[in-house]
């Protein structure tokens, strides 16, 4: 039994040129926190940029914050919710289909 060299590259399927397997996701532009901006529950205008339309806290992937900034932001959002400066949930009215 003789061992022959097998060319794997010859049998590898080639992807069409210029095509991607998965489309790229479009994220919202990150909001940059300036050095003079303080992450505080009273700063509602800054906090509003870090919650979604459904009043959920956005992830670090979307906001591009550091670990420390994300933790401070989530604590500030939770405090603002308790003091009713921000809503816990956003109630949307659904249209009836019939």
Curated annotation (Swiss-Prot):
Keywords: Chloroplast, Plastid, Ribonucleoprotein, Ribosomal protein, RNA-binding, rRNA-binding
Subunit structure: Part of the 30S ribosomal subunit.
Region of interest called Disordered, as start-end residue ranges on this chain: 1-26
GO MF, one example: structural constituent of ribosome
Stored InterPro entries: Ribosomal_bS18, Ribosomal_bS18_sf
Native source organism of the sequence: Gnetum parvifolium
GO CC list: chloroplast; mitochondrial small ribosomal subunit
Family stated for the protein in its record: Belongs to the bacterial ribosomal protein bS18 family.
Residue ranges, compositional bias (Basic and acidic residues): 1-13
GO biological process entries: translation
Subcellular localization, as worded in the UniProt entry: Plastid, Chloroplast
Protein known as: Small ribosomal subunit protein bS18c
Signal sequence, renumbered to the chain: none
């Amino acid at each position: 039994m003789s061992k022959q060299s097998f060319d794997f590259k010859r049998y590898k399927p080639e992807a069409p040129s210029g095509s991607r397997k998965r489309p790229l996701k479009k994220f919202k532009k990150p909001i940059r926190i300036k050095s003079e901006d303080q992450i505080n529950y009273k700063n509602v205008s800054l906090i509003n940029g870090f919650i979604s339309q459904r009043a959920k806290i956005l992830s670090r992937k979307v906001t591009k914050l550091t670990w420390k900034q994300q933790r401070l932001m989530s604590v500030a959002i939770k405090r603002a919710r308790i003091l009713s400066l921000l809503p816990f949930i956003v109630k949307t009215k659904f249209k009836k289909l019939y």
